[in-house]
């Protein structure tokens, strides 16, 4: 499909909010043995559970490598789940897939951001990453969507949350990190976000969740639930390393107005744990130079904020934690018109993320 030389904003396109109607959700089948334990088999089982949970509400497309295609196809043998073959380096389609944008005339296009595995050779999580860099373009080709390419600008989809009405929330920890776009300052990065997402206001939270190996992705920490309202990971424990991060974010949100001039309504979501991998879980991960080391002493960045909104549903992680029930109740109260489905999130978390990181929604065309 055609790669355009303009920007979504110039062409009348914008990134819609996650609660906008969707045609499908994209996923990628996990298999990387230096990230997922036991050759990825427990993570694959978790992906089957996730795909089937989403498929109750809308179609799912799962991309699998040639070597895993038949295995994935057999395990995902369900009418609402399509399996396609796309070579990849890992399963984080939120960060490697396209950011879909829409206009008011029923068209859907996609933004193909630069990708460097969360930092390249300065703190990145694996190398090479060339197949992941190509994944967004292949998805857009399959969907016959025209493509915008941000040549020389690195961004992961997990580092942004939009309200669809002109505001994006992100973190300084990630977007201003020297290992993403060191040649650009804050103002230049904001200009790219305005052009590619068609937003007017960029809300900068200082940091994401403690020990998030993506350098503080906002989708693990603070997300939009409706225009003017966000859900923020929260702890009242002053000894928790997340305490300062949560309170700093709250200060920004309390003193910021969105693109429509609204004050933010902030809902608090408890943080599970602290959660740690067991020695046995860590031992199941292949040790490869340049890949993220797994260590039972390192706290996992578990978060209930890492959920996905689908048509009529909320797909959220549970952690066999005392806070699971409270998290479910909070989501049910915030989303009264959605069915809250919680699925076990531990295997996904052991790989470095969760449900939102491992999914990418494709918005439905809109005609006004």
From Swiss-Prot:
User: What domain of life is recorded for the organism?
Assistant: Bacteria
Q: Name one GO biological process term.
A: putrescine biosynthetic process from arginine
**Pathway membership of this protein?**
Amine and polyamine biosynthesis; putrescine biosynthesis via agmatine pathway; N-carbamoylputrescine from agmatine: step 1/1
What EC number is given for this enzyme?
3.5.3.12
Chain segments annotated as coiled-coil in the UniProt record: none
Under the heading InterPro entries, the entry gives:
Agmatine_deiminase, Peptidyl-Arg-deiminase_porph
Extract the SUPFAM superfamilies matched here: Pentein (SSF55909)
Q: Which residues are the active-site ones? A: 357
Q: Which PANTHER family match?
A: AGMATINE DEIMINASE-RELATED
Instruction: Report the protein's function.
Output: Mediates the hydrolysis of agmatine into N-carbamoylputrescine in the arginine decarboxylase (ADC) pathway of putrescine biosynthesis, a basic polyamine.
Query: What is the similarity comment for this entry?
Result: Belongs to the agmatine deiminase family.
Q: What is this protein called?
A: Agmatine deiminase
The taxonomic lineage of its organism, from the top, reads: Bacteria, Pseudomonadati, Pseudomonadota, Gammaproteobacteria, Pseudomonadales
- Gene, per the UniProt record: aguA
């Amino acid at each position: 499909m055609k790669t355009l030389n303009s920007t979504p904003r110039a062409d009348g396109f914008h990134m819609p909010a996650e609660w906008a109607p969707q045609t499908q959700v994209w996923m990628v089948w996990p298999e990387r043995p230096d990230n997922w334990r036991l050759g990825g088999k427990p993570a694959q089982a978790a992906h089957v559970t996730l795909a089937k949970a989403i498929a109750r509400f809308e179609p799912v497309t799962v991309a699998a490598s040639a070597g895993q295609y038949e295995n994935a196809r057999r395990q995902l043998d369900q009418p609402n789940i399509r399996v396609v073959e796309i070579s990849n380096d890992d399963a984080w389609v939120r960060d490697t897939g396209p950011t879909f944008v829409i206009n008011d005339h029923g068209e859907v296009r996609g933004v193909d951001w630069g990708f460097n595995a969360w930092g390249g050779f300065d703190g990145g999580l694996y190398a090479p990453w060339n197949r992941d860099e190509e994944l967004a373009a292949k998805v857009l080709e399959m969907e016959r969507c025209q493509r915008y390419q941000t040549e020389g600008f690195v961004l992961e989809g997990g580092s942004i949350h939009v309200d669809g009405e002109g505001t994006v929330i992100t973190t300084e920890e990630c977007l201003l990190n020297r290992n993403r776009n060191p040649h650009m300052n804050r103002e230049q990065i904001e200009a790219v976000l305005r052009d590619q997402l068609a937003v007017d206001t960029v809300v900068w939270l200082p940091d994401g969740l403690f020990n998030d190996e993506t350098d503080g992705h906002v989708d693990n920490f603070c997300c939009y639930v409706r225009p003017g309202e966000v859900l923020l990971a929260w702890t009242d424990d002053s000894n928790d390393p997340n305490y300062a991060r949560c309170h700093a974010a709250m200060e920004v949100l309390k003193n910021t107005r969105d693109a429509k001039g609204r004050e933010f309504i902030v809902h608090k979501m408890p943080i599970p744990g602290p959660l740690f991998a067991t020695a046995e879980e860590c031992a199941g991960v292949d040790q490869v130079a340049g890949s993220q080391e797994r260590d039972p002493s390192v706290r996992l960045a578990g978060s209930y904020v890492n959920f996905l909104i689908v048509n009529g549903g909320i797909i959220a992680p549970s952690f066999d934690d005392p806070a699971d029930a409270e998290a479910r109740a909070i989501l049910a109260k915030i989303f009264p018109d959605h069915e809250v489905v919680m699925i076990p999130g531990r295997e996904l978390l052991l790989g470095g993320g969760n449900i939102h990181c491992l999914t990418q929604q494709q918005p439905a065309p809109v005609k006004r």
